[in-house]
């Protein structure tokens, strides 16, 4: 099993999946190293991309964040479009300054699609491990 990675992402929630995907795209496997350069650690890989009790994507703040992530090549918005079961415009009667869209996603399908997408991502290894600490040597991660 490979143990040498340039980037190790701990956790497969929203931030972890985006970080792992972005790092895998940026660190193209051209350095001569064999194998992926990015690892995503999750105690249970079947829970990667699993949504909280509220499977909503959007709203004033989160909607803006998702749009910015999408503009940077992220996958959260794409996966939301694939798995949405209801769309709604929020604050429609209050004017354009506070109007926002929100999608309700199928929780199980969202996680399934996210896992499938990341599994196919070149340069990314998904590993079923726990990070119990970070080893440093002379002030650097070793």
Residue spans for each PLM region:
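Conserved N-terminal/central alpha/beta ligand/cofactor-binding core
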Residues: 4, 21-22, 26-133
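Beta1/beta-strand and adjacent pyrophosphate-binding region of the FAD-binding site
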Residues: 2-15
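Conserved beta-strand-loop-beta-strand element in the redox core of flavoprotein oxidoreductases
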Residues: 133-142
């Amino acid at each position: 099993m490979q143990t040498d990675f340039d980037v190790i992402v701990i956790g497969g929630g929203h931030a972890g999946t985006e970080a792992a995907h972005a790092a895998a795209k940026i660190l193209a496997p051209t350095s001569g190293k064999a194998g992926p350069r990015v690892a995503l650690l999750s105690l249970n890989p079947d829970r990667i991309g699993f949504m909280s009790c509220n499977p909503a994507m959007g709203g004033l703040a989160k909607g803006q964040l998702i749009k910015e992530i999408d503009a940077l090549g992220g996958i959260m918005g794409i996966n939301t479009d694939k798995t949405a079961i209801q769309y709604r415009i929020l604050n429609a009667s209050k004017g354009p300054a506070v109007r926002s869209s929100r999608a309700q996603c199928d929780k199980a399908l969202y996680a399934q699609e996210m896992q499938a997408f990341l599994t196919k991502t070149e340069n990314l290894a998904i590993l079923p491990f726990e990070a119990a600490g970070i080893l440093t040597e002379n002030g650097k991660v070793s």
